[in-house]
Amino acid sequence: MTLPLLNNIQAPFYEVFFSFQGEALYTGLPQIFVRFAGCNLKCNYCDTSYSIVVSKKAKHLTVLEVIKKIEVIYKKNKKSFAFTKPSIAFTGGEPLLYVDFLKEIIPRLKTRGFAIYLETNGTLYKNLTQIIKFCDIVSMDFKFPSECKKSFWKEHKKFLEIATSKKTNSVFIKCAMTKNTTLQEIKQTIKIIKSTAKDTPLILQPSLDKNKPKLQNLYLFYMFSKKYLYNVTLMIQMHKIYKIR
């Protein structure tokens, strides 16, 4: 079924490419990545800092132009999806800044048989309400004040409530661990998860660069989290190890 376009909306992008998911619960999953340009935050540890701003290198594309790129990439890599449903990973930047674009493109990708993987900083909960019914996987961050200069606890709680309101999707939380991460931040994270959706998987993701946390702190954060939550994993970003996108 072909859906009519409601408008000729555009959004800024840095790249559309094929790779394997490099972090969290779906590590190793073949995906087509769609990277938006622009973010509403500026975290110190961001591993795609170039995508925070919309520079001259960003390309402004329409819904149909992005779909065409996805279809070409899928055709070239079809064998990689032989044993799994093909999925589109919307990443950034922050995809939810462009919710009007997402509302147009996601239903069209779903009718083409693609699953939708949303990677987000977990702050724009009002925008999430407009597309959550289409999302198969939601990878949301908890952003800590120690690295992002501001707390987003209220936003994260509301975001998690909306993300888990659709019972048929997969939702998990990623927390970047740096040398500045505090036990109080871990405690607040646990408090929100326990009071909102206690079975949501929590991924503690240590930084691998100069900001990496001390091993004893990682152990402390992990053991403390496991004391109160059932589903906690300590996991590094594998794509950085293998130097793939």
Model-derived regions, located:
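Flexible, charged surface loops at secondary-structure boundaries
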Residues: 27-28, 74-75, 81-83, 110, ...
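Conserved AdoMet/S-adenosylmethionine-binding subsite of the radical SAM
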Residues: 97-233, 237-245
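Conserved alpha-helical substructure of the radical SAM core
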Residues: 47-89
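Short, Lys/Arg-enriched, disordered terminal segments
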Residues: 1-10, 82, 111
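Canonical Radical SAM [4Fe-4S] cluster-binding loop centered on the CxxxCxxC motif
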Residues: 6-65
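Short, solvent-exposed beta-strand edge segments and adjacent coil->beta transition regions
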Residues: 29-31, 85, 172
